[in-house]
Swiss-Prot record:
Lineage, highest ranks first: Eukaryota, Viridiplantae, Streptophyta, Embryophyta, Tracheophyta
Species whose genome carries this gene: Petroselinum crispum
Protein's recorded name: Caffeoyl-CoA O-methyltransferase
Sequence similarity: Belongs to the class I-like SAM-binding methyltransferase superfamily. Cation-dependent O-methyltransferase family. CCoAMT subfamily.
Reactions mediated catalytically: (E)-caffeoyl-CoA + S-adenosyl-L-methionine = (E)-feruloyl-CoA + S-adenosyl-L-homocysteine + H(+)
Cofactor(s) this protein cannot do without: a divalent metal cation
SUPFAM superfamilies: S-adenosyl-L-methionine-dependent methyltransferases
Tissue distribution of the protein: Roots and leaves.
């Protein structure tokens, strides 16, 4: 069991950008964990045992997404990048019983880790899971025509080198007034560090892609944006035209 704030942080909040581990732990223990649905807690604990657990959405971000979806009365949503399904479950629990989520990931095996928990929570019927790259699916939807402006919310937590390619397509699929959420837009804090600063190899590899995305979103007149230091940074884009 963790014996100090730093080790606790590495266990339960590895994506927090807060400077104080104790403060992040306070947020989790005071506001997040006491209100976390039992199914989300179970999935979080199962995911923590997975060797790629760094890929999961943090508990505080899951709580934020769940609240956000309720506030905008979302019903038709999309998620690109699912992993074990923690953020997907947060979404499914927030949607009405007839709500729908188009969920895409290249690895169904990871999704199936969380699927029994999702089904036990009674929300599996809301999810249409597609295994494989998302870009061809998005292109097909755009070509079809009937999906234009139909999504209330889209959450992207996938390959950072394709975020701009996703945005080019999603902007036409989300409705006017709808939201797109891009995860990891502060990318371990590396976006504010010099290019030659020491950082992990995978962080360095995707850093420039994230920086370019942030610049592109800030310059896009079709959206209003809000970058939040939740989890590893999430940027909300509200389509206005």
């Amino acid at each position: 069991m963790a014996s100090n704030g730093e080790s606790k942080h590495s266990e339960v909040g590895h994506k927090s950008l807060l400077q104080s581990d104790a403060l992040y732990q306070y947020i989790l223990e005071t506001s997040v964990y006491p209100r976390e649905p039992e199914a989300m807690k179970e999935l979080r604990e199962v995911t923590a045992k997975h060797p790629w657990n760094l890929m999961t959405t943090s508990a505080d971000e899951g709580q934020f997404l769940n609240m956000l979806l309720k506030l905008i009365n979302a019903k038709n949503t999309m998620e690109i990048g699912v992993y074990t399904g923690y953020s997907l479950l947060a979404t499914a629990l927030a949607l009405p019983d007839d709500g729908k989520i188009l969920a895409m990931d290249i690895n169904r095996e990871n999704y199936e880790i969380g699927l029994p928990i999702i089904e036990k929570a009674g929300v599996g019927h809301k999810i249409d899971f597609r295994e494989g790259p998302a870009l061809p699916v998005l292109d097909h939807m755009l070509e079809d025509g009937k999906y234009h402006g139909t999504f209330d919310f889209v959450f992207v937590d996938a390959d950072k080198d394709n975020y701009i390619n996703y945005h080019k397509r999603l902007i036409d699929l989300v409705k006017i007034g709808g939201l797109i959420g891009y995860d990891n837009t502060l990318w371990n804090g590396s976006v504010a560090q010099p290019a030659d600063a020491p950082m992990r190899k995978y962080v360095r590899y995707y850093r420039d892609f994230v920086i370019e995305l942030n610049k592109a979103l800030a310059a896009d007149p079709r959206i209003e944006i809000c970058m939040l230091p939740v989890g590893d940074g999430v940027t909300l884009c509200r389509r206005i035209s």
